[in-house]
């Protein structure tokens, strides 16, 4: 019997490929689709003759049947034919026919059953094959789409066509189909829209429509999305027959936009042929693409678009999308014009812009902002996202329906820069989402001189977007209408689903990396083809002329009209006498400055508060303002301790921060604190978000229960990213001066992962782009034996980048000297030693009449240090931030007796005071704390030095000599005293690593620096 079944299996014809069989077994949806066909199957019947005792007889009958089917009884003939046709067990056997008048009819019926069974199976398998074919196009059709306008490369870097994509009929066999099936009609599954109004189509037409939808100039990558509704939406947009239609008016608008894009670059090339401008030649379609996205978004209710982009095509975008005055752009090419504004300025292809205008297509107001950026590719991505989030927050746009972002990328940078990945992973986090960004990749298939095969390991440069289920639309940029359609769909996707979407413009770069570069050195064959390539404007104009949409004179008139606009603007640019960087401001703050951009005053009010306000905030900070909310027992003890401090009129570090935040919220200042684990605090000191111990995910933020009409407080744990998150918070702070935006590093050591944001945006941002920013960086810092990665926020690096002159003593008699210093510096660097001073510097950040970045080296061990407490008296009305905290002990009472004046900053003060007391030197050694390191407090330190005429001067720090503050403080302190005395050093020796990881070594080093600080004879041999 086994032999019979084996023979039958061998003889069974293969009607479909193994792929289709697997598909039919593993796809329950397909089974449901063909359920009505499967109802023809006969119920299982007994086959009692197939027993072991009769196997020899059955095998003899089978062999006889193979030689001559007519040599066996008709019932055996039917049985063997059914078995070979693949009938399931129990259905092959038909009962012997009775000898009656109706026997002939019964024989005919049995014969029909024999023939029907294989037909039904073939029908099912063919339908499954067609469904598998349709799905193959949907999944992999983009691999064989005609995307490269040069016709040289496959845009996906894979030269092999997927074997299961049919581009010719010889591949039908892969699905168990053949040419005889091409004219058969197949029912279409519900997962395709190629039928339009029809539910069934011939296979030939199915293939043709799939080729049109997925294998022409658009490659749609979307089947990795795990949401059926979203996949169906995309299928409907690209599969529906005739859906990609444009009116003649739309075609003329597209042509006009291509004219502007192309002729702008040609005008710049004629006038400044030797200037770098990073032109758009080869991807001129970018301008109409962006305008289409903006038009469609405006139609859907968006009234503010924030953009970020690299250098390629930036001037064209400024001119033809944002509509910057052409003469202002042309002025940037004039090397004779001087800048009117202070600061370094930046090259023309880095500048930003802000403009409000009427969208002529929708007749609605729209605001466009292009964020200024450095040459560090993709660094502006999170900045744009942060600014977008802020603008959405300020206008109450909780769903992203009014404010959106568009990010432009180069193909090499999009694949190569890690910040792209970090930014994508912010896209759907509750406190960071902007409800969808439209990404446009200018994929010119080259990175400077690097071939794509050397620039990425993934098939496409856009594959990073798959991690957030963003659909990716690849499009041949030499087909302007395909580009326009894809951009419309991208805008609609963002409006409908509020998720990211990527448009991959596969294009080429007609010139070198810049206009002076020779690309033939490294890409000779590509550039031979490019030299032959007809510009897209010429191609499209010829197409429209052939279609009768425009005629040649109309086309030429459009060109001459725009050329005239450029010439007139060029003439006006000759009248400009000076360059104004502030004309390129990307984030104006209306009403904050005077009309000429100056602060409205040069003073700062007291940052103190009344005792009632301090007490009220303290009481809320030490309680749970929500009923039936169970907190952790350990947290109850922390809140109880806070309550006792309030009663005793003292604050620790966490409570001082709470009071600064709470008071600003009362004044209508929004506060946003972001970073890793900031809700609780890395050191479990903050606890701004309380968690119910009995109800999962139930939380309470007491800070939002302080006042009836307070501003909202946002505190959010960030993703484990520094670069992306700091960039995001910088962008958030750009949007408004009336918000305190803080980013806290988990440890200060980790800020260098975000070094690009610090070096390119925060430090020089105002100098380059006339753009102030009040972001606050909280960087936990302190040498406590925790090793080289948990000790140092690298203060030496921040101080090195301060813009004051160490060798020039400013005019100390100048009115408002301290405020003028703050106004002129590029950022403020502080290291507070008391909670009260920390409270004041946070409040001062908002009460100042201008904005500067604030770098705070925050403590770790001081968070719970019993001496690191401040009284309410230090925070009452009339009090201010103390730039310098002078000695106030016995040494200050008898300054003539002081032998040494120690200057220090931060936590080391408490080590010094403890050691001084232990050595009984409180009258001989004075200790002055410099709380604000930059701008340097020349005026206050001069008073301190003059107060102790007999004292030698020493700087004491816990950091190593080549790190920390010494190299910054020493020359400035020497300048303060006109170099009358040396400034000695007491601290750790130079080292490569910031700190030791050995506790004993740490304590030995600490004792050594304390010995140096209090040994009054140690420096005599160096005099």
Swiss-Prot record:
Give the subcellular location: Mitochondrion; Nucleus
Q: Where does Mg(2+) bind?
A: 411, 444, 446
> Which reaction is catalysed here?
N(6)-[(R)-lipoyl]-L-lysyl-[protein] + 2-oxoglutarate + H(+) = N(6)-[(R)-S(8)-succinyldihydrolipoyl]-L-lysyl-[protein] + CO2
Gene Ontology, cellular component aspect: mitochondrial matrix; mitochondrial membrane; mitochondrion; nucleus; oxoglutarate dehydrogenase complex
Q: Which residues carry this modification: N6-acetyllysine?
A: 401, 970
Post-translational modification N6-succinyllysine, affected residues: 74, 564
Q: Does the keyword Transport apply?
A: no
What the entry lists under Pfam families is as follows:
2-oxogl_dehyd_N, E1_dh, OxoGdeHyase_C, Transket_pyr
Cofactor dependence is on:
thiamine diphosphate; Mg(2+)
Q: Which coarse location class describes where this protein primarily resides?
A: mitochondrion
Q: Carries keyword Nucleotide-binding?
A: no
Instruction: For the cross-link Glycyl lysine isopeptide (Lys-Gly) (interchain with G-Cter in ubiquitin), list the residue numbers.
Output: 534
Instruction: Describe activation and inhibition of this protein.
Output: Calcium ions and ADP stimulate, whereas ATP and NADH reduce catalytic activity.
EC numbers on record: 1.2.4.2
Q: Which residues bind Ca(2+)?
A: 143, 156, 158
Family statement: Belongs to the alpha-ketoglutarate dehydrogenase family.
What's the stated role of this polypeptide? 2-oxoglutarate dehydrogenase (E1o) component of the 2-oxoglutarate dehydrogenase complex (OGDHC). Participates in the first step, rate limiting for the overall conversion of 2-oxoglutarate to succinyl-CoA and CO(2) catalyzed by the whole OGDHC. Catalyzes the irreversible decarboxylation of 2-oxoglutarate (alpha-ketoglutarate) via the thiamine diphosphate (ThDP) cofactor and subsequent transfer of the decarboxylated acyl intermediate on an oxidized dihydrolipoyl group that is covalently amidated to the E2 enzyme (dihydrolipoyllysine-residue succinyltransferase or DLST).
Q: What else is known?
A: The mitochondrial 2-oxoglutarate and 2-oxoadipate dehydrogenase complexes (OGDHC and OADHC, respectively) share their E2 (DLST) and E3 (dihydrolipoyl dehydrogenase or DLD) components, but the E1 component is specific to each complex (E1o and E1a (DHTK1), respectively).
PANTHER family to which the protein is assigned, alphabetical: 2-OXOGLUTARATE DEHYDROGENASE (PTHR23152), 2-OXOGLUTARATE DEHYDROGENASE COMPLEX COMPONENT E1 (PTHR23152:SF7)
Q: What is this protein called?
A: 2-oxoglutarate dehydrogenase complex component E1
Its ancestry begins with: Eukaryota, Metazoa, Chordata, Craniata, Vertebrata
User: What is the gene name?
Assistant: OGDH
């Amino acid at each position: 019997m086994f032999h019979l079944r084996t023979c039958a299996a061998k003889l069974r014809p293969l009607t479909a490929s193994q792929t289709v069989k697997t598909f039919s077994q593993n796809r329950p949806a397909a089974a449901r689709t063909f359920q009505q066909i499967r109802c023809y199957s006969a119920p299982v019947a007994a086959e009692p003759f197939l027993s072991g005792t009769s196997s020899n007889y059955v095998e003899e009958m089978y062999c006889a049947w193979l030689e001559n089917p007519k040599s066996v009884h008709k019932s055996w003939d039917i049985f063997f034919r059914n078995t070979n046709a693949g009938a399931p067990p129990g259905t092959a056997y038909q009962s012997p026919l009775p000898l009656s008048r109706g026997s002939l009819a019964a024989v005919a019926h049995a014969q029909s059953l024999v023939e029907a069974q294989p037909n039904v199976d073939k029908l099912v398998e063919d339908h499954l094959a067609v469904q598998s074919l349709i799905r193959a196009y949907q999944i992999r059709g983009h691999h064989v789409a005609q995307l490269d306008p040069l016709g040289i490369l496959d845009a996906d870097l894979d030269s092999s066509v997927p074997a299961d994509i049919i581009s010719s009929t010889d591949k039908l066999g892969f699905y168990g189909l053949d040419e005889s099936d091409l004219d058969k009609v197949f029912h279409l599954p519900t997962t395709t829209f190629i039928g339009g109004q029809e539910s069934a189509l011939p296979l030939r037409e199915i293939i043709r429509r799939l080729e049109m939808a997925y294998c022409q100039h658009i490659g749609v990558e979307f089947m990795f999305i795990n949401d059926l509704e979203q996949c169906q939406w995309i299928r409907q947009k690209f599969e529906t027959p005739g859906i990609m239609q444009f009116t003649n008016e739309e075609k003329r608008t597209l042509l006009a936009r291509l004219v502007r894009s192309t002729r702008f670059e040609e005008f710049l090339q004629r006038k400044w042929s030797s200037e770098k401008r990073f032109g758009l030649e080869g991807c001129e379609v970018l301008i109409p693409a962006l305008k289409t996205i903006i038009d469609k978004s405006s139609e859907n209710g968006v009234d503010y678009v924030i953009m970020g982009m690299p250098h390629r095509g930036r001037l064209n975008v400024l001119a033809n999308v944002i509509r910057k005055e052409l003469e202002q752009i042309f002025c940037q090419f004039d090397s004779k014009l001087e800048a009117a504004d202070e600061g370094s300025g930046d090259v023309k292809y880095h500048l930003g812009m802000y403009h409000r205008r009427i969208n002529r297509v929708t007749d609605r107001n729209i605001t466009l902002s292009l964020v200024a950026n450095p040459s560090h590719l993709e660094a502006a991505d999170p900045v744009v996202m942060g600014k977008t989030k802020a603008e959405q927050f300020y206008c109450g746009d909780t769903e992203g329906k009014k404010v959106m972002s568009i990010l432009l990328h180069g193909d090499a940078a999009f694949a190569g820069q890690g910040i792209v990945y970090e930014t994508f992973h912010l896209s759907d986090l509750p406190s960071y989402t902007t409800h969808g960004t439209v990404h446009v990749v200018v994929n010119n298939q080259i990175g400077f001189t690097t071939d794509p095969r050397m620039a990425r390991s993934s098939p496409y440069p856009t594959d990073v977007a798959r991690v957030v289920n963003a659909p990716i639309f690849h499009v041949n940029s030499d087909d302007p209408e395909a580009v326009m359609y894809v951009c419309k769909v991208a805008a609609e996707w963002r409006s409908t689903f509020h998720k990211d979407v990527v448009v991959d413009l596969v294009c080429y770069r007609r010139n070198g990396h810049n206009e002076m570069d020779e690309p033939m050195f490294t890409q000779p064959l590509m550039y031979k083809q490019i030299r032959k390539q007809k510009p897209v404007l010429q191609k499209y104009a010829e197409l429209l002329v052939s279609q009768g949409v425009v005629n040649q004179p109309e086309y030429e008139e459009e060109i001459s009209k725009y050329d005239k606009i450029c010439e007139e603007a060029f003439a006006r640019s000759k009248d400009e006498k000076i360059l104004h960087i502030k004309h390129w401001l990307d984030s104006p703050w209306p009403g904050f400055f005077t009309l000429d951009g100056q602060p409205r005053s040069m003073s700062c009010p007291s940052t103190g508060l009344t005792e009632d306000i301090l007490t009220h905030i303290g009481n809320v900070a030490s309680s749970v303002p929500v009923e039936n909310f169970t907190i952790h027992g350990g947290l109850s003890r922390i809140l109880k301790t806070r309550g006792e401090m309030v009663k005793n009129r003292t604050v620790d570090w966490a409570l001082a921060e709470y009071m600064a935040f709470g008071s600003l919220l009362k004044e209508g200042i929004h506060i946003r604190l972001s970073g890793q684990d900031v809700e609780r605090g890395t050191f479990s000191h903050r606890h701004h978000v309380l968690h119910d111990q009995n109800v999962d995910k139930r939380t309470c933020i007491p800070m939002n229960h302080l006042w009836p009409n307070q501003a909202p407080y946002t505190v959010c744990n960030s993703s484990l990213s520094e670069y992306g998150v700091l960039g995001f918070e910088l962008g958030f702070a750009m949007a408004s001066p009336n918000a305190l935006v803080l980013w806290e590093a988990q440890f200060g050591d980790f800020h260098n992962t975000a070094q690009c944001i610090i070096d390119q945006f925060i430090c020089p941002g105002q100098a380059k782009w006339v753009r102030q920013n009040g972001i606050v960086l909280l960087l936990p810092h302190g040498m406590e034996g925790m090793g080289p990665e948990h000790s140092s926020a690298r203060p030496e690096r921040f101080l090195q980048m301060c813009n004051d002159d160490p060798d020039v003593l400013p005019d100390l008699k100048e009115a408002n000297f301290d405020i003028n210093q703050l106004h002129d510096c590029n950022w403020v660097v502080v290291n507070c030693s008391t909670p009260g001073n920390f409270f004041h510097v946070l409040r001062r950040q908002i009460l100042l009449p201008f904005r500067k970045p604030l770098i705070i080296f925050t403590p770790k061990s001081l968070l719970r240090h019993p001496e690191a407490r401040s009284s309410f008296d230090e925070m009452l009305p009339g009090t201010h931030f103390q730039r310098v905290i002078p000695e106030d002990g016995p040494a200050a009472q008898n300054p003539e007796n002081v032998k040494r004046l120690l200057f220090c900053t931060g936590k080391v003060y408490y080590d010094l005071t403890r050691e001084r007391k232990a050595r009984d030197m409180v009258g001989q050694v004075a200790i002055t704390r410099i709380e604000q390191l930059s701008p340097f407090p020349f005026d206050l330190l001069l008073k301190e030095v003059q107060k102790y005429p007999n004292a030698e001067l020493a700087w004491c720090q816990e950091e190593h000599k080549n790190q920390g503050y010494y190299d910054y403080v020493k020359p400035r302190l020497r300048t303060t005293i006109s170099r009358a005395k040396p400034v000695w050093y007491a601290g750790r020796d130079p080292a490569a690593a910031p700190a030791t990881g050995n506790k004993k070594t740490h304590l030995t080093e600490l004792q050594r620096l304390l010995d140096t600080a209090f040994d009054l004879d140690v420096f005599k041999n160096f005099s």
